[in-house]
Each structure stands twice: as C-alpha cells, then as structure tokens.
Amino acid sequence: MLSEIWRYPVKSMRGHQLTEATVEPWGLAGDRRWMVTDADGSFLTARELPRLLLGVPTPGADNGLRLHADGLGDLVVPAPGADARERTVQIWSSSVRARDAGDDAAAWVAELVGADVRLVWLADPTQRPPNPAFARTDDRVSLADGYPLLVTTEASLEALGGGFSMRRFRPNLVVTGSKAWAEDDWRVVRVGGPGGAVFRAVKGCPRCVMTTRDPDTAEGGREPVTTLARLRRFDGATWFGTNLVPDTPGAVVREGDVVEVLEEVEPGAGPLR
C-alpha cells in the first residue's frame, strides 16, 4: 500500500507530504522544478549548503512559491515569465536552460544559506534525459538528481534500525506492507490498481552525505550512512530506495492506493546497478 507521497518544490529544501499527486513524465507535478545555483549556474544542494534544508517552499498560483524560514520574512516568488533572464545551468553532467527568479529571491536564499546564490525555475522540463544506461532515450527528468521519482519502503527503513526518519532519504513514494529490500527486485510496479500509475524501476539509489543532515536542524552526523555501509554496501556505495520512471503520465497516485509488483526478479542480487 502507498503510505506516503512527498513533493520537493525546490531542490534540497523541505518537502511537503501530500494525499495525492499527479504523475508527469519527469516526476510528480511540481516536484523539483526550482533549484539553487551559484553565480556561474552550477547547481547547489544541502550537500554543500546544509541550511537549504531549513527553507520551506509552499507552491502558489501559476507555479509560484512562498518561501519561509524561521528568522526570515516570507517571500512570494512568482514563476519567472518568458521575459525573465534565461540562464544555462548545470546539474551533474546535464546542462539545461532555466529562468532566473530575480534579485529578491536570490537575496532571500543567500541570507538563508550565507552564500552568493541564485534561484532558478525550469520552465521546460522536457530538456533533460536520465542516464541512458538505465532509462529510455525518450524518458525525462526535471531537477531531481537522476531520475523522476524515488520509492522507499517502511520495511527497509525498519530493517536499518536506529529510528531514522524517512525524511532523511527524501522519497517521493513510500510503500508499506512489503518485505525489507523487496524494492531491489521490482522492475514494474503499479499504484492504484487497473488503470492506475505504472512505473519502471530502473536503478537503485546510492546514498550520500545528504542523508546525514537532520532535516529539521540541518545538523550533520555519521548516520545513517554508517549503518548503510554495514548493511547495504554494494560496489563501493551505500544504497537505499529505488528510482522510478513513469509510464503513465497523467495518472494520479493517492495515499492508501494499492501497490502491485507487475514484474520482478529473483531476490538476492541487491539493488539494480
């Protein structure tokens, strides 16, 4: 069963739990269409700027945002129009064209994180393909790290022990009722029964220092990476969750939906990699 749905309007800022969401070809509607960059257009995340986690973006009308953080005044940021400054921005090995949100938005985020930054909006989410070694050439992803959605399971979180919050792993979909690490073996899943949303499971998710940042305080530590290194180390990386690509854009997923595994492989090989 689908127990949680999460959307992250601004890459590396706080997420919002939803009761339902529309699936688009590049991810959930409104997920990671905004991003923080340096002055040269290179993407920045809470890996480098942990205080990004303390920003609370609330989606508004016409793709706009309201930005909030304790100690800072709220700021309403309209989605930049066609006449806004367009910039080439870099996210990992991809370059895309995005619209700059202006100096007020940049100043607000700069005050939050203590660095010279810009805030940009991806007006055209059809520009960026995922890694073709794992996805199809016509698949697309917005400003998520690599793939449109991430699914995790409550059983796998419980298997880690330690009382870790699922929020550290920043999933889009959380599933309950499976066995621990069952998501390693999924290849096609459907959410919502016949006529529901169908996803391809294309690659496991290697985890980084982001998971060691407390999502409420931005304080760093060694967990859960230390535990993952003990329990979930494959090919020199630590893994938790599985990346998904939508095959039924326009479908709606809802909290409480049935989750069916339509195709899977024999267990034992670990995450798809």
Where are these regions (language model features)?
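Metal-cofactor-dependent catalytic cores
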Residues: 1-273
